[in-house]
Amino acid sequence: MGACGSVMQDEALKEQARIHRQIEKSLEKKKSALLEQSVLLIGPGESGKSTVLKQIRSVTVCRAMCGGYTKHELEEKKLLILRNLWTFSDMLLEYVIKNYLDMNETDKKKYKVMIEELKFCVMSGGHMGDELAETVKVFWLCAPIQEAYEKRNTYHLTESAGYFFENIDRIKMPDFQPTNQDIVRIRVPTTGVVTADVILKNIKLSVIDCGGQRQERRKWYHYFDDVHAVLFVAAISEYDQKLVEDESVNRMDEALNLYHIVFNGKYFTKAACILFLNKIDLFREKVKSVSIKKFHPGFEGANTAEDGAKYFRRKFRDGMHPDFKKRLYCHETCAISDQVQIIINTVIDTVVQENLKDTGMI
């Protein structure tokens, strides 16, 4: 019953609708109580796990038709966006200075002041205003900063930086309200364990998001019992990048090793296994100029997104314990795209369906 692939063809959508109707019918029998489902969300750092969690919340909010983020939560998101702009600006300027890119001393001093003003906005809970916003726009568009942004993979600057800089005119407004797309672009590394409970009709979905950095992983094992599904997120676009924690280790190799440890047969004997090969949009662009074989010598296909994705899917699958292969659901995703919500809808139904089978309800 395993499935692998990310394209929602007509037949797949019809099957999803059939499964959803079956689940709805089964849940009608248990109206008096919530069906509780738990999903463990794991993967290496920078893979996009927290973004997936935001999209899960967005999907369940839409399906339950119970409103969005609270006013207080949106205010927190606004401050996080400003914090991201402050951090991204600091990283870009630091790269320019350390690598002796062509920027005069006057501009360096001006942009250091700009960064301090962004910091003050964050600390004071204010908004940036027109004058500061204009300086940020000039900063973003200047040649050395653009050059530094193009080299972002070498110093762990995320692609969200460009998104927020391009949206300065909207973000600077006093009445700015973050959209769902803004929220999923926010970068805040997960430390510790974050649990989000979302309610969808008769389903209570508890999603446990565990920090992906190496020092956080020892905490995962406390959550390995009694989960209904494991959602593992790996950034397929990072096949040429190094770990933040260890510059000698390739990020894709780290993801593969971690995945095979998790699915070695000791844990999750009844849980659905779901793999998101995330950041597929960046992967499709990157393979146009960056060799897969250079970083993964075992790759023998054409240097295309199709052959590359097929190779990495096989690498993840081949190292699994045989019992898990028949329960693996693999999707190529872009967690910042609203289209991922279609996949997440399918994942939610998959988790519920597997549990209902185990309990004999369908």
Curated annotation (Swiss-Prot):
Region: G2 motif; residue ranges are: 182-190
Which InterPro entries would you find in this protein's record?
Answer: Gprotein_alpha_su, GproteinA_insert, P-loop_NTPase
Q: Record's superkingdom?
A: Eukaryota
Q: Give positions of region: G5 motif.
A: 333-337
Q: Where is this region: G1 motif?
A: 38-51
Q: Which residues form the G-alpha domain?
A: 35-362
- What sections of the sequence does the record tag as coiled-coil? none
Which cysteines pair up through disulfides? They are none
**What does the UniProt keyword field contain?**
GTP-binding, Lipoprotein, Magnesium, Metal-binding, Myristate, Nucleotide-binding, Palmitate, Transducer
What is a single molecular function from GO for this protein?
Answer: G-protein beta/gamma-subunit complex binding
Per the record, lipidation of type N-myristoyl glycine is found at: G2
Q: Which residue ranges does the record annotate as region G4 motif?
A: 274-281
Q: Supply the Pfam families for this chain.
A: G-alpha (PF00503)
- In this record, residues modified by a lipid of the kind S-palmitoyl cysteine are C4
Q: Where is this region: G3 motif?
A: 205-214
Q: Which Gene3D superfamilies match?
A: GI Alpha 1, domain 2-like (1.10.400.10), P-loop containing nucleotide triphosphate hydrolases (3.40.50.300)
Annotated residues that bind GTP are located at: 43-50, 184-190, 209-213, 278-281, 335
Could you state one GO biological process linked to this protein? adenylate cyclase-modulating G protein-coupled receptor signaling pathway
The residues that the entry says bind Mg(2+) are: S50, T190
Q: Which family does it belong to?
A: Belongs to the G-alpha family.
Q: What does this protein do?
A: Guanine nucleotide-binding proteins (G proteins) are involved as modulators or transducers in various transmembrane signaling systems.
Assembly description: G proteins are composed of 3 units; alpha, beta and gamma. The alpha chain contains the guanine nucleotide binding site.
* Protein name from the UniProt record: Guanine nucleotide-binding protein alpha-10 subunit
Whose protein is this, by species? Caenorhabditis briggsae
